[in-house]
């Protein structure tokens, strides 16, 4: 029994499969809740996810599966600006996913990579190689193709047209918020020496009071609105999806570390690029989305862009490793 469990724990294919499943699960469950009839309590959804995340990693820690540092007030004070940025990022992400289909959301999310790359050039002395630049051009092209595919479908209705561009507004805001979050968090991690689960613990713990306060202040908690957000015919399924999406966020983090441990960072980066294809396709399978030549083409162009970017980053890492020995 122990040998079979050890074999699973050290299996590359199983770790890769688990990472892909957890990524798809979180995206699909979020979309299920957010695309519900007139769902408008995004802050509540995000608060529930953060609470579930804290409970889950706390349980895993008690069983000795993971470890993270104890709560420290001074560390929490220093980390609080990151938590605020996280709230902005996940809220704008939820709003974008509410209005856009999963394939379009996934494709436009690639544009965040461009902002982060040039942010690293400005703040950390990074560089953008020719191959990386080529992947950026492919990302922009895939986004234009996705926009054209959505435009072709939504052009007939005024309401859907407004909702579409509202989705693009939230997506653009999310790209900038995500880039700011990643870049500033990277700088803070270097100062605090946080590990993955330390980061997850503080991010979610500090986000909970912000999200709950925002929900109470900005969202309608009347009985009528709660009935709209949680209709009796699918109330249980909606709540279950909210809880499941919170647990799957832990799964993504755990499976990421698992995948890197039993394979390599190179394999993991390739899996991250390849995983965009099944996530985007899951949106076409599980939800009503624009299915035409342009929407399908944009998925595969975006997939190719992610693949080219992963290869570019691998080559750059190899060059960086070989630099000290060349001196």
Swiss-Prot record:
The gene is VRG4. One of its GO terms (cellular component) is cytoplasmic vesicle membrane. Homooligomer. Glycans are attached at residues 158, 234. InterPro entries: TPT_transporter. PANTHER family: SOLUTE CARRIER FAMILY 35. Keywords: Cytoplasmic vesicle, Endoplasmic reticulum, Glycoprotein, Golgi apparatus, Membrane, Sugar transport, Transmembrane, Transmembrane helix, Transport. The chain crosses the membrane at residues 5-25, 37-57, 79-93, 103-125, 132-149, 164-184, 208-228, 239-259, 267-289, 293-312. Involved in the import of GDP-mannose from the cytoplasm into the Golgi lumen. Residues 26-36, 94-102, 150-163, 229-238, 290-292 are lumenal. It is found in: Golgi apparatus membrane; Cytoplasmic vesicle membrane; Endoplasmic reticulum membrane. Residues 1-4, 58-78, 126-131, 185-207, 260-266, 313-327 are cytoplasmic. It is a multi-pass membrane protein. The keyword Transmembrane helix applies. Belongs to the TPT transporter family. SLC35D subfamily. This is GDP-mannose transporter.
